[in-house]
Amino acid sequence: MAKHIVAALQIGSCPGSTKDTLKKILSYEKEIKESGAKLVVIPEATLGGYPKGSNFGVYLGYRLQEGREEYAKYLAEAIEIGNGEKYPEISQLCALSKATDASLCVGCIERDGTTLYCTMVYIDPKDGYVGKHRKLMPTAGERLIWGQGDGSTLPVVDTAAGKIGGAICWENMMPLLRYAMYKKGVEIWCAPTVDARPI
């Protein structure tokens, strides 16, 4: 197997602004190009934001109005995922991938109707958006705001760096998920996570 450079773009979200966060990601174009990276992994929930410490106005037995307002803002910052002009954030990530000749694995908050998912998207320099993985089991309080993935989004993607796939945060501790990916031939494991503990 040939050697390739794989990079982690260790950045955080711009609170409350997916637009500003996307600009921040795109601002690394020159550095990604100069690094020669063939794969760049961007942390869990970077686009859309990880609402660490928020409770969205929920206390056992209570739902407060200010929490509903906070959730509505969070929902508005989430992105829709797919190919084409209808998906401007994905289109801009595809342009970055093409310009840098690097595949991207990007953590984002996906909006599908009124359900949010913690998702990682795979972008290829030649083919653009090639797949996504929705977090199967949001951890603890995350279940208040994110839906569960159904297992249909466990791709292993062929890239110039090798076959990539992975899991988000605590999913990396799920042996059957890992086994499923190994059976699909994953060579490079992507683990975008907000969690600072070892995986």
UniProtKB/Swiss-Prot annotation:
Which N-terminal stretch is annotated as signal sequence?
none
Indicate the segments forming the CN hydrolase domain, all copies.
2-199
Write down the superkingdom of origin. Answer: Eukaryota
Which Pfam families does this entry report, sorted A to Z?
CN_hydrolase
> Which Gene Ontology MF annotations are present?
hydro-lyase activity; nitrilase activity
Q: Which InterPro entries match?
A: C-N_Hydrolase, C-N_Hydrolase_sf, Nitrilase/CN_hydratase_CS, Nitrilases_CHs
Tell me the active site.
44 (proton acceptor), 135 (proton donor), 169 (nucleophile)
**Family per similarity comment:** Belongs to the carbon-nitrogen hydrolase superfamily. Nitrilase family.
Identification of the protein by name: Putative nitrilase-like protein NIT1
State the species of origin: Saccharomyces cerevisiae (strain ATCC 204508 / S288c)
